[in-house]
């Protein structure tokens, strides 16, 4: 088999290493690749004790992608069990249905333990899940021991080692339960995180919302400004209200244009000046001085006009 594959491929190296590690069967699981296909494995797992699957021995396929271990495998059960559909890719956090929860550090052994740990759990409508009654599952568990795989030739009666009652067996059961719990918890966390990120990504706002917020802040910062200053500032903030399109439906060019328009709005001199409070007394003082100067100039012009008129009359009489 080694001569048929590129030994420099990370997937080939990883699968050959795992095949060597799983070569010897245990009392709970066993898995090996087919003789003519390194990327398809057949596995056998024992049903978890103290459950509806106690006493059952279940067989299935693991189809691995060329990108393994960066992408998860697909898992297909071949033995009727009452928990997973036969001949269909099942939906687990470690399977190809959930690449977002898969970790490259997980292995085929991880998948086998997860299958054992997930068997007593509820399907909850997942793809490939079944919810048979406990009686039906126990009957299928007994029937599973007579199954023989045509693809690899494995017989369920002798493919696994006899079940032990020692600490190794209980440790494997506990490890499977703990692994299933951790994977399930990780899937829930990732699912909630994905919901949050999608809601943030799909959230859109319009410039109207921005206009509603800016005057409030501006009025709080310039409570002592005159009414005319507030009106001019409010007028400088007024912009046409056009809703901003969602990021997911805009082209890169449209997103860049949107970002540039937002930057121009935020760096506008009117906006910058609007956030800088002015001294009301300084404005009134300057206006008063200007009024006085204009009044004095007007009075000087009037007096000069009167003076010139009187001087002309005096010269005329002489």
Swiss-Prot record:
Upper lineage: Eukaryota, Metazoa, Chordata, Craniata, Vertebrata
Keywords associated with the record: ATP-binding, Endoplasmic reticulum, Membrane, Nucleotide-binding, Phosphoprotein, Transferase, Transmembrane, Transmembrane helix, Ubl conjugation, Ubl conjugation pathway
Modification sites for Phosphoserine: 184, 266, 268
Record-level Gene Ontology MF annotations: ATP binding; ubiquitin conjugating enzyme activity; ubiquitin protein ligase binding
InterPro entries according to UniProt: Ub_conjugating_enzyme, UBQ-conjugat_E2_core, UBQ-conjugating_enzyme/RWD
Source superkingdom: Eukaryota
Subunit text: Component of the HRD1 complex, which comprises at least SYNV1/HRD1, DERL1/2, FAM8A1, HERPUD1/HERP, OS9, SEL1L and UBE2J1. Interacts with E3 ligase RNF26. Interacts with E3 ligase RNF133.
Active-site residues (renumbered): 91 (glycyl thioester intermediate)
Induction: By Dengue virus infection.
Transmembrane segments: 283-303
Membrane topology: Single-pass type IV membrane protein
This enzyme's EC code(s): 2.3.2.23
Enzyme class of the recorded protein, top EC level: transferase
Source organism per UniProt: Homo sapiens (Human)
Catalytic activity: S-ubiquitinyl-[E1 ubiquitin-activating enzyme]-L-cysteine + [E2 ubiquitin-conjugating enzyme]-L-cysteine = [E1 ubiquitin-activating enzyme]-L-cysteine + S-ubiquitinyl-[E2 ubiquitin-conjugating enzyme]-L-cysteine
Gene3D superfamilies on file: Ubiquitin Conjugating Enzyme
Residue ranges annotated as Cytoplasmic topological domain: 1-282
Record protein name field: Ubiquitin-conjugating enzyme E2 J1
Pathway(s) annotated for this protein in UniProt: Protein modification; protein ubiquitination
């Amino acid at each position: 088999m080694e001569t048929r594959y590129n030994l420099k491929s990370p997937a080939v190296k990883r699968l050959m290493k795992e095949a060597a590690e799983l070569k010897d069967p245990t009392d709970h699981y066993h898995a090996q690749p087919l003789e003519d296909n390194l990327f398809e494995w057949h596995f056998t797992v024992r049903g978890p004790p103290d459950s509806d699957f106690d006493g059952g021995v279940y067989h299935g396929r693991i189809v691995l992608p060329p990108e393994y271990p960066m992408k998860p495998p697909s898992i297909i059960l071949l033995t009727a069990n009452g928990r997973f559909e036969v001949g269909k890719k099942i939906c687990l956090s470690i399977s190809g249905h959930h690449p977002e929860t898969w970790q490259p550090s997980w292995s085929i052994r991880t998948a086998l333990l997860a299958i054992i740990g997930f068997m007593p759990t509820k399907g909850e409508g997942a793809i490939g899940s079944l919810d048979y009654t406990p009686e039906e599952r126990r009957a299928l568990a007994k029937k599973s021991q007579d199954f023989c795989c045509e693809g690899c030739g494995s017989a369920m009666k002798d493919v696994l080692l006899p079940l032990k009652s020692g600490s190794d067996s209980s440790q494997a059961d506990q490890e499977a339960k703990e692994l299933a719990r951790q994977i399930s918890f990780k899937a829930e966390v990732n699912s909630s995180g994905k919901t949050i990120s999608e809601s943030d990504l799909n959230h859109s706002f319009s410039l109207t919302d921005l206009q509603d917020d800016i005057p409030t802040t501006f009025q709080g910062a310039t409570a002592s400004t005159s009414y005319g200053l507030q009106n001019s500032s409010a007028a400088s903030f007024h912009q046409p209200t056009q809703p901003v399109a969602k990021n997911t439906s805009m082209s890169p060019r449209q997103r860049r244009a949107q970002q540039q328009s937002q930057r121009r709005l935020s760096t506008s001199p009117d906006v910058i000046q609007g956030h800088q409070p002015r001294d009301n007394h300084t404005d009134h003082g300057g206006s008063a001085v200007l009024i006085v100067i204009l009044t004095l100039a007007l009075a000087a012009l009037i007096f000069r006009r009167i003076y010139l008129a009187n001087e002309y009359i005096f010269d005329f009489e002489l």
